[in-house]
Amino acid sequence: MAKILAVGTVVAIASTYGTASSMTALTNAANAVATLAAGHGVAVGDFVEITSGWGLINGRIARVSAVATNDVTLEGINTTSTTNYPAGQGVGSIRRITAWTNLSQITSGLSVSGGEQQFADVTEITDRTQQQIPTTRSPIVVELPVYDDPSLSWTPTVRAASDSAVATAVRMIYPNGSRLVGNAYWSLGDVPTIEDSTLRNSVTLTFAAQPTRYAT
């Protein structure tokens, strides 16, 4: 059991990507293995964006834990359920993230909302107690309050992601070395606010797919 302080958390946006590499196979496994075309260039430790015929992992970001020629292991991508992941239907492509840009001047007010399980009411007329069954989860939204400074090196990258309305990867590294990666829609405020006599702004991330958490 550990209590992890948030001070020292590093947030980054994917600033460049490699060319997408097509899959010829994607396995059902606790850590799915993608067979890629030759010359893919993917190495152990790389983070990749997954495009897949399996909707539950489409758009997710994963770390590569092993490479054996053209077989690439996607750490933390569990596809063992053939109900959720029908065999042979998951092929697509992966795109390697080749550079990250760290965000600076994030204040201590980082907040997370969403992700809560939603339920449908299935109460029947004969029931004396309401019944519910789980459906979807609400979207995860992370708000990063920052001290406003348009000259910061990360601003053009975040602004481009905000303007494009295309999901772009985010990486959060916590002080204990654990990390979270995901694909999110970025939004950067156009007009700064004033708080405690300083200019502030807000970077909002709305996750487009389930994030992946790693202990190290």
Regions found by a protein language model. Give the residues of each.
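Small/polar beta-strand repeat architecture
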Residues: K3-V7, I13-A29, A37-H40, W54-R128
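Short coil-to-beta transition motif at edge beta-strands of beta-rich domains
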Residues: A37-G55, S162-A169
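Well-ordered beta-strand positions in beta-sheet-rich domains
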Residues: F47, N58-R63, D71, R179-Y185, ...
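Short, acidic/charged, Gly/Pro-enriched secondary-structure junctions
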Residues: T101, W154-N183
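Oligomerization/assembly interface segments of phage tail-like spikes and tubes
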Residues: D121-E124, Q131-P150, S197-T212
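Short structured motifs
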Residues: T126-Q130, L188-G189
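Short, charged, solvent-exposed linker or helix-capping segments at domain edges/interfaces
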Residues: T155-P156, Y214-T216
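Short beta-strand and beta-hairpin "edge-sheet" elements
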Residues: R171-A215
